[in-house]
């Protein structure tokens, strides 16, 4: 149990979103640390599941192989495998809570000469539990959230850790423990403090995001000044922390209590910026001539995006491809009956999107039950001209490479992409459920 937080075990794994909004609204996060480590998040998830009896409704060690919707039966047939044996389950609805990472393989990147390297090459997604990197020289290739998390945690034991990045990222330091949150917990009732803290963490990131998008140059200078103040004199902002894009064109990296910058100032960590020319038996050489000696190379170059967890999806035996279809109100998929994807936000805590999705699905189920409907299918109306838009409005490398795997958003109507939790929550609770939606009455067979 725990998904990413159980499967990913690299050193220092933690959230890069605050747990006050990343956690469940019905079971508020109570720890003092707003950015939590993987083990704490895993424990929190298990406690929530036990407290509300969710764990008693989970079939563990079951792998979903395929899911087929039958128009005749008005239900799904799901093929699963457990202990080497296959069986089927039937249900009216499917909620795809599989995340959006490929947990079988990482994102493939071309690193020239990597096959020449005689040391260990490790992807953070598949970190060996028995890896001893004490007094080793480690090169971490990448500049995203995983690399920023790894650097200070590896530097504690390694002889030297060098971050090798093709292009820089914005890194923002935040307090590990929020003093204002602690004051609220000290002087206010628990329920009130939890609500106020959650609202604070809902509003401040949203305001900052909109400032970044409205005043990009101001935001860029602001964040760069913050990074410059934290960097040691030996490391300059340019070129190592001078991205070619403005804040929130790609997701910002965060580090708790300056741990990333402190590791750079300790002398145990360093940073090299430039394209890799080649990898030798024991080093990385950049096009600018820098040589990074290494016993271990960590390829923190991004994650491969995948929806549906490798399950084959079909409607009446006809294969269904996520990438060929539009997303209805961020929840359901065009032409796919009684099914939803749990999708979050690039500019806020992912689980806020899951919360909005859950609200929408519960409301849809009640609407169908009260009207005696057996199926709901989002439809693009005949003659409706939609212009495709990206589901995630970021230009990060792993997002760009995933365009062929993600469904599409549209430019109008219920097909527009999600951007704002408050808007989506209102739509989920009060919005129109019938717009571009075909409902099938119980007892009426119909080809879908």
Where are these regions (language model features)?
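Glycine/threonine-rich phosphate-binding loop and adjacent beta-strand/alpha-helix elements that clamp
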Residues: 296, 300-368
């Amino acid at each position: 149990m725990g998904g990413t937080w159980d499967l990913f075990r690299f050193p220092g794994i933690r959230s890069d979103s605050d747990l006050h909004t990343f956690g469940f609204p019905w079971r508020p996060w109570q720890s003092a640390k707003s950015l939590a480590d993987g083990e704490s998040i895993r424990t929190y998830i298990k406690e929530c599941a036990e407290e509300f009896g969710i764990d008693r409704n989970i079939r563990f060690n079951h792998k979903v192989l395929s899911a087929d919707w039958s128009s005749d039966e008005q239900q799904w047939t799901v093929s699963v495998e457990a202990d080497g044996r296959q069986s089927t389950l039937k249900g009216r609805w499917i909620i795809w809570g599989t995340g959006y990472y490929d947990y079988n393989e990482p994102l493939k990147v071309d690193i020239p000469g990597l096959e020449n390297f005689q040391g260990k090459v490790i992807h953070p997604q598949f970190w060996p539990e028995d890896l001893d990197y004490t007094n080793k020289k480690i090169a971490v290739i990448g500049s995203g959230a995983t690399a920023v998390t790894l650097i200070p945690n590896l530097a504690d034991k390694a002889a030297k850790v060098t971050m090798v990045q093709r292009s820089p990222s914005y890194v923002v330091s935040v307090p590990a423990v929020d003093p204002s949150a602690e004051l609220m917990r000290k002087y206010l009732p628990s329920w009130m403090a939890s609500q106020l803290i959650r609202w604070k963490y809902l509003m401040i990131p949203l305001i900052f995001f909109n400032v970044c998008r409205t005043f990009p140059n101001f935001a860029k200078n602001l964040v760069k000044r913050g990074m410059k103040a934290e960097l040691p004199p030996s490391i300059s902002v340019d070129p190592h922390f001078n991205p070619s894009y403005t804040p929130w064109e790609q997701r910002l990296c965060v580090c708790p209590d300056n741990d990333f910058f402190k590791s750079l100032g300790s002398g145990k960590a360093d940073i090299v910026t430039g394209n890799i020319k080649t990898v030798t038996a024991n080093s990385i050489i950049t096009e600018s001539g820098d040589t990074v000696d290494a016993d271990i190379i960590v390829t923190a170059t991004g994650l491969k995006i995948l929806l549906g967890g490798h399950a084959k999806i079909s409607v009446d035996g006809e294969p269904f491809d996520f990438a060929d279809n539009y997303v209805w109100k961020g929840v359901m998929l065009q032409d796919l009956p009684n099914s939803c994807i749990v999708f979050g936000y690039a500019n806020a805590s992912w689980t806020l999107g899951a919360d909005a999705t859950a609200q929408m699905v519960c409301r849809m189920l009640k609407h169908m039950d009260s009207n005696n409907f057996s199926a709901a299918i989002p439809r693009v109306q005949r003659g409706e001209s939609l212009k495709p838009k990206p589901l995630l409005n970021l230009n990060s490398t792993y997002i760009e490479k995933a365009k062929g795997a993600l469904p599409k958003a549209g430019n109008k109507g219920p097909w527009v992409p999600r951007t704002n939790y408050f808007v989506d929550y209102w739509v989920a609770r009060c919005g129109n459920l019938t717009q571009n939606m075909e409902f099938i009455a119980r007892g009426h067979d119909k080809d879908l």
